[in-house]
Amino acid sequence: MNLSPKQPQNSFSNNLGLAAYSRGMGGLGLPGDLSSMSRFVRAAFTKLNSLSGSTEEESVGQFFHILGAVEQVRGCCEVAEGKYEITIYTSCFNADKGVYYYTTYNNRRITAVDMHRENLDSASLVKYPMLDKEDILQQN
């Protein structure tokens, strides 16, 4: 077994300068490894085979599920000693309605910013704080 969150080292030959072409290659051989190519293919497969509902909410939710299939989880892909690649945020935008949706690594709840609730003719920059603290809905 050679699976690891660390980048693999060339153990083939000292005379051949083999280098990893992508982060996450310590998982090569593991079904669904974390290399860029594998993640791209998995994202394409998931997008092309997923089923979405007909509402805006269902489509947005499905989008985040699709990208969740390829997100980077802290600890699985080491980029430097003690530092790991993570999916910092995921976002999509409904250009017809002017709504920007996002989640962050630390807050999985989907946040929406409706651009049409702002004065789009204003010369002032409008900014919102990124909601990056886990937001758990307490049901009872």
Give residue spans per PLM region.
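C-terminus-biased signal that marks the final domain/tail of proteins
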Residues: M1-N140
